[in-house]
Amino acid sequence: MEAMPCHNQRLGAAGGPRPQDEQTAPAGGCSRLIRFAEPSEGSSSGSPSPDSSSGSNGAAAAPSPAAEDCASPLGAQLKLLPMNDQIRELQTIIRDKTASRGDFVFSADRLIRLVVEERLNQLPYTECTVTTPTGYKYEGVKFEKGNCGVSIMRSGEAMEQGLRDCCRSIRIGKILIQSDEETQRAKVYYAKFPPDIYRRKVLLMYPILSTGNTVIEAVKVLIEHGVQPSVIILLSLFSTPHGAKSIIQEFPEITILTTEVHPVAPTHFGQKYFGTD
C-alpha cells in the first residue's frame, strides 16, 4: 500500500518533493519527509509565541497551499506522527477558535492518545509464550517494564489520562515551571518523581512547544535527578520550528514526537482544555 504523505507535503500534478527536502532515517528505518509549514498570510514566523498557555483564544489558520515548504534541519531526533485526514481534522478543530470546549477536549484527547500509542510502539518489547483457553501455545510479545511519565504542569496534565489509558500502572511524576515575575525566566517551583526515575525511560509530556524554554528547564531538572537525555522522549501535539530546534540544540540526544511543526502554535490549549479561557 502506498504510504500516506506527510501533511505538509503538497499533492497533485505539481510533481513530487524536491530532492533537497528529503531526509533519510537511520539504518533500519524508512525514508520520510519532515517539513515545516509556512505561516498563514499576515502572521509572523520570526517571533515565536510564548510557551505558556496564555494567549488569544484563536489559533492561526492552516497554511496556504501555495506556501513554500522548507526542510527540517533537526534530523532523526524530531519525529512526526504519520499524517492522515483523521489527524488533520483533529488538528483543525483544536486550532479553530469557534470550536466548543466539548469538541476541543474530545479532539485533544483523541490526538493525545494517538501520540502516546505511536511512542509506545517504539519502546522495547520482549518475546513471550502464552497459553490460550483452548490450550494452544501462542508466541507473542510483552511490554518491558521500566518506563514512567512526567507531565509539565499545567497543560501537560492533559496528557496524563491518555498515557494511563494505554499503561494502567505506569508511574507519573510532575514538574511545575513558571516564569519569574521579575526576570521573566523559567523557574522550577515544584518537582516530584518516582524515586528510581534515573533507571527508567521517561515520557515527558507537554502539548505545546513554543519557545522550548519550559521543556529545557524540565529536562535540566530530570538530569539533576540522574536521568540521561538519551532516555527522555518528549511527547507533544504541536511545535514551532524554533521550539523544537532550541530543545534539540540544548540536548541533542533527546527525542521529540509531535503531530505538526508550524510557526504559530495554539497557545490557548491549556486554558481551553481546562475551561479557564
UniProtKB/Swiss-Prot annotation:
Uracil binds at T267, H268, F269. InterPro entries: PRibTrfase_dom, PRTase-like. 5-phospho-alpha-D-ribose 1-diphosphate binds at R154, Y206, P207, I208, L209, S210, T211, G212, N213, T214. GTP binds at R101, R110, E144, K145, G146, N147, R171, R200. Residues 37-69 have a biased composition (Low complexity). Residues 1-69 are annotated as: Disordered. Its main location: cytoplasm. It comes from the Eukaryota. Pfam families: UPRTase (PF14681). Transmembrane segments: none annotated. GO terms for molecular function: GTP binding. It is found in: Cytoplasm; Nucleus. Keywords: Cytoplasm, GTP-binding, Nucleotide-binding, Nucleus. One of its GO terms (cellular component) is nucleus. Belongs to the UPRTase family. This is Uracil phosphoribosyltransferase homolog.
